[in-house]
């Protein structure tokens, strides 16, 4: 879902703080958390944001794997965003930088620790590292199917030894109805997005698709 305008600048710190996977071993000192950020007023932040926090207490590592990095300097950014033609990428930033960005704009950040085994933590870290390779980190953002939330969810699902069972979503929900919940106070943004949505956006969706 999504992202913060200034946080792409912090990507330059990534190489300084990222640890090689081979140097880490599965252990209880590692913790992964899901970060859920409250929506903002800018069009790219209307739907909130999701990221993954990685902590290794043995060496005080505290990083955020953030699929919401982008450059607002991209020509015609807002127009391209509404049309679904914006490229995003995975970035890695120190957690204090990530948290302070949302604190400065008065948005809450909620954290949920993931109940993973040591082996699952190892696999999740490996998947994120693979995604961070230069040839893999950039992706074409999509409101519903490929964004910060779906990418974090997909990596968690791939790391788990088993199947994730989600609670039932609210009946009758559609992509469009959920979009309207978040754009109620931004009529022009809502209109622009509505114009780009097709008939598929009006079909009922299950709980997994409602996560976008």
Question: Which ranges hold each PLM region?
Answer:
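Soluble extramembrane regions of membrane proteins in the secretory/endomembrane system
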Residues: 24-212
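Bacterial Sec-dependent N-terminal signal peptides
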Residues: 1-26
């Amino acid at each position: 879902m999504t992202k913060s305008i200034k946080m792409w600048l912090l990507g330059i710190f990534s190489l300084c703080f990222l640890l090689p996977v081979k140097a880490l071993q599965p252990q209880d000192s590692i913790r992964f958390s899901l970060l859920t950020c409250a929506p903002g007023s800018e069009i790219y932040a209307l739907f909130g944001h999701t990221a993954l926090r990685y902590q290794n207490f043995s060496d005080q590592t505290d990083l955020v794997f953030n699929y919401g990095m982008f450059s607002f300097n991209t020509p015609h950014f807002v127009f391209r965003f509404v049309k679904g033609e914006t490229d995003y990428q995975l970035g890695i930033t120190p957690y204090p930088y990530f948290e302070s960005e949302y604190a400065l704009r008065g948005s809450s950040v909620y954290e949920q620790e993931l109940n993973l085994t040591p082996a699952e933590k190892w696999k999740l870290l490996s998947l994120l590292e693979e995604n961070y390779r230069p040839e893999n980190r950039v992706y074409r953002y999509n409101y519903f199917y490929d964004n910060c939330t779906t990418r974090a969810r997909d990596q968690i699902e791939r790391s788990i030894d088993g199947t994730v069972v989600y609670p039932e979503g609210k009946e009758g929900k559609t992509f469009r109805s959920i979009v309207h919940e978040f754009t109620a106070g931004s009529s022009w943004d809502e209109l622009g997005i509505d114009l780009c949505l097709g008939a598929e956006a009006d079909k009922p969706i299950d709980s997994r698709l409602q996560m976008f």
